[in-house]
Amino acid sequence: MLSCIFKDTIFLSSFLAVSLICMTTALWGTILLVERRPLLSESLSHACYPGLLIGALLSYKVPLFSDSLWIIILCGCAASILGCLCIAFLEKKLAMHKDSALCLILVSFFGVGVILVSYVKDSCPLLYNKINAYLYGQAATLGYAEARLALIIFCLSAFVLWWWYRQISVAIFDREFAYSCGLRTRTAEMIVLVFISLVIVSGVRSVGILLISAMFVAPPLSARQLSDKLSSILILSSIFGGICGALGCYFSVAFTCQSIIEGKATVIVLPTGPLVVFFAGVLVFLCLIFSWKTGWITRYIRRKLFLFSRDEEHLLKIFWYLQEQNIYRVSMWDFVRSRKLQEYFGSKAFSGFRMFWLCKKGLVSCFDHQXFLTDKGEAKAAKLVRAHRLWESYLVSELDFNKSKVHNFAEEMEHVLTDELDTTLSKMLQNPDYDPHKREIPKLKGK
């Protein structure tokens, strides 16, 4: 079935066009996402609607522009750029909030487009059927001319991002530094704006004005979950965009089926644009769940491992506190009646597995139903208690905390206090011997 589909030249042209357009939107969507302006694509896609309609009318009624694709693209880009300039004017000159300006331009330009559609519907019925594709997309009408145009725009976009990568990245992350270095950030901004408008206009027939903004957001958002490096995000985002476009095109053809409705055979065709956006949404969901850096499953496992490590350290501290009471060989009864056990674990039953794990790691030894710290376990427990009491001393002496309110803060910090921070605190506090509660601060071996 796959080979039969790809032998169809009509399908192949739309397949290539949609895939390339989605790759290009993902590239420029990454720039918008990093600039924290992802909604700009939504406003510009709606702002280009009246320009597309004016271009379609010119190509339909003016013999000079008869059936010209370029006049439609130019008019659409002009309307999109005008919309962006209006947004900037509202924000800078009229002090309008960014979101309010985006919404105002979106509905205003789209409203003008709807008025033009009503005119086209009455005066040019044939053209009306054609321009409906701008709203929801109609990938099947994309031929090799559109595919070649999409390839040209993708290659130009990739070249511009490669050539202007340093200027664009500096302008995004540190605009003031870019100004001080004499970089032409205004030129970079205009290039980004022109290409975003061009990509939107060339892509509305594949996904539609109402859905194309999703392809500016979803692939970059997926790539952002997998990397922190801008160049890697750009590459991954483009790949993800191409995959979503290819899957949407393929499944819209592969799952075309017939059904019987009221005794008549009807062909059910899954639209390409919504399918592309659907796969993009699925990709975002999968990356949010399974990303090895920030995915929900990764964070869940990391949190569970931290809690397990924290409980292990709490057990070592219980041994230490019992040693301060001259109980060196700890029985189960000593553990159960320990006040610290109730503080750390509450009413939970004592876990024999945790004790077994401490023995396995060589931190605790067990003999004759009694447990005691090994040298390794005692060193780790001393380090934890030292971190706790040092942090209490710092909060009281340097930040003027009440000594009765520092215990909970120290309980949180003791598990993440590094050796470097320990050394810094010791120097700052002049190597104290006692904490604010007059308890001895353990000394580290070798210091």
From Swiss-Prot:
For the keyword Cell inner membrane, the answer is: yes
Q: How does it sit in the membrane?
A: Multi-pass membrane protein
UniProt entry keywords in alphabetical sequence = Cell inner membrane, Cell membrane, Membrane, Transmembrane, Transmembrane helix, Transport
Q: Which family does it belong to?
A: Belongs to the ABC-3 integral membrane protein family.
At the top level, the lineage of the source is Bacteria
Query: Molecular function (GO) terms listed?
Result: DNA-binding transcription factor activity; protein dimerization activity; transition metal ion binding
Function per UniProt: Part of an ATP-driven transport system TC_0338/TC_0339/TC_0341/TC_0342 for a metal.
What this protein is called in its record is Probable metal transport system membrane protein TC_0341
- The regions listed as transmembrane in this protein's record are 14-34, 38-58, 69-89, 100-120, 152-172, 192-212, 233-253, 270-290
Localization terms from the record: Cell inner membrane
Single GO biological process annotation from the record: transmembrane transport
Q: What is the source species?
A: Chlamydia muridarum (strain MoPn / Nigg)
Please provide, in alphabetical order, the Gene Ontology terms of the cellular component aspect for this entry: ATP-binding cassette (ABC) transporter complex
